[in-house]
Amino acid sequence: NGDISAWDVSNVTRMGEMFSGATSFNQDLSNWDVSNVTDMRGMFLGATAFNGDISAWDVSRVTDMSYIFFNAESFNQDIGGWDVSNVVDSSSFDSGALNWQDDYKPNFQ
């Protein structure tokens, strides 16, 4: 795995399934500017080793977070501060994320 922490993703709008099935992926994405992303569907689906701090991400434009952490077994970061007010699909958002504490999850209205 090459270092992708400095990638410029500021113009990306769709990150759906970006790391889907990447079972050994656990890189630092904390500095990524995802403020233009609208689709994060299945982004970390099956990324069983991922537990990166993405709490500072601006996800306020995201509308689809379905399956984003589906079977992301190691994920246990506090993203409770995420603005998910524009999310219209959060189905199976965290199914199978076995180690994730409920109070770390965003509050979908």
Regions found by a protein language model. Name each.
Residues 1-109:
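Negatively charged
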